[in-house]
């Protein structure tokens, strides 16, 4: 049975949709004012894997992922570039879709845009106002009265009394309490006309948090089975969503809350605000990029490497970005494709009674543990290389498909040049044998994973090394010796 870690309860729980066999899943998507970076790639791929596994498990999924197409950052980009809001958002939506296609991210079933649901947002604001949870401020904004919602902080574990004004929430002089947040922003004279809507409160536009409350409730109803998003959304965005939706309608907004871990760069989260980001297209483009073209030529080998880089780690664990880590991911993916190139797959699909398929399923049913699932892929690759088994190769390819991997033709895959693997300098060359330094580095990474009790990751590293012809022997005292098989 599938178990999911619920951020709300802080425990791993058996997953039971409100309606048997049907899953209503909402994920907070992009604010479209710039290109997607690798941190966004992690969120997109993580929830793509989630919905793929739910469907592979026989569940009917209604997957909604929104687009925020009105926001302060979008307005600034439009003003800076002299373009209309719609021109900015349409361009970056097209760019986002190009990135998703490159990474093998399947489109959500529905992809609403915030500007299509302003009427529904105003309805929720009116409900909150009638219940004393929203008020009109002197500056024309409509704010949420946070202290009127007794459960505020239940998702993030933050206490209102412990939150200091100005630390995480901007202080506004028109707010009754510095922790209150805006539901409706009054129009400013200098703002473009296409950022303003008529409302009972005068011209203005919605605040960020109210958008998701309106779209999720309108499209999926309450409660959602799963609400997901990036690590930085737990507070304040998701906390505020709960306050709005549950304050307006009563009952739970979502039964399960999921948050993927951050992508780190030198101990900091990758983000545009820190300036330490690398875009998806910079990482996987084939040839030059243009800031006037949303579409771009993709290197399919590098694109799948980036997806593999994300999938081989558990979605909740922090993941570190470094160029060497991409090289390591490329070499590991090459070894899986080499097994498929060496042995023709039987094409029979997944045999779930087979031991490695059972291990794969057990891992995925354990909070979508794709790291453990990847370990099963390497065991199959090792078997295919050792025995020439078409069945093992077929299982490898079919299980890879569940994760959105290993569907390229192996000879064509190796013909694509890659910037991330020395083994690709010769067309069609198999992954080069790991040298001693690389093996020792992988053993050190495995030891760190074991120390952090991430045993699935440790097992995955062992399986990757075995597929590369390296056997490990754990000795007493934490020492690990290795030998070439």
From Swiss-Prot:
Its main location: cytoplasm. The keyword Protein biosynthesis applies. GO terms for cellular component: cytosol. A motif ('HIGH' region) lies at residues 30-40. One of its GO terms (biological process) is cysteinyl-tRNA aminoacylation. It catalyses: tRNA(Cys) + L-cysteine + ATP = L-cysteinyl-tRNA(Cys) + AMP + diphosphate. ATP binds at residue 272. Monomer. This is Cysteine--tRNA ligase. It comes from Bordetella parapertussis (strain 12822 / ATCC BAA-587 / NCTC 13253). The lineage of its organism: Bacteria, Pseudomonadati, Pseudomonadota, Betaproteobacteria, Burkholderiales.
